[in-house]
């Protein structure tokens, strides 16, 4: 992990087309601005974790299992 010290209005460039700019620094909070191509997904860490967790739960739900069982039974019935 690269760790940098930056002041307000400073920026960090990643690759050729991603810029992270320090917008403001307050007590216990830093506001960042991101400039990146539209195809680049930018998410807060906690949001990414929540999405991953929900996707994992959804894939293990009883509904998904029931659909899988129905698909299996339909395939077996066609034989």
From Swiss-Prot:
One of its GO terms (molecular function) is mRNA 5'-UTR binding. Its main location: cytoplasm. InterPro entries: CsrA, CsrA_sf. It is found in: Cytoplasm. Disulfide bonds: none annotated. Keywords: Bacterial flagellum biogenesis, Cytoplasm, Repressor, RNA-binding, Translation regulation. GO terms for cellular component: cytosol. GO terms for biological process: bacterial-type flagellum organization; mRNA catabolic process; negative regulation of translational initiation; regulation of bacterial-type flagellum assembly; regulation of carbohydrate metabolic process. It comes from the Bacteria. A translational regulator that binds mRNA to regulate translation initiation and/or mRNA stability. Usually binds in the 5'-UTR at or near the Shine-Dalgarno sequence preventing ribosome-binding, thus repressing translation. Its main target seems to be the major flagellin gene, while its function is anatagonized by FliW. Homodimer; the beta-strands of each monomer intercalate to form a hydrophobic core, while the alpha-helices form wings that extend away from the core. Belongs to the CsrA/RsmA family. This is Translational regulator CsrA. It comes from Helicobacter hepaticus (strain ATCC 51449 / 3B1). The gene is csrA.
């Amino acid at each position: 992990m690269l760790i940098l010290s930056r002041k307000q209005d400073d920026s960090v460039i990643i690759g050729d087309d991603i810029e992270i700019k320090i917008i403001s620094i307050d007590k216990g909070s830093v506001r960042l601005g991101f400039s990146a191509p539209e195809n680049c997904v930018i998410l807060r860490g906690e949001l990414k974790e929540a999405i991953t967790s929900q996707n994992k739960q959804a894939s293990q739900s009883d509904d998904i299992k029931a659909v899988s069982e129905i698909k299996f039974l339909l395939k077996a019935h066609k034989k």
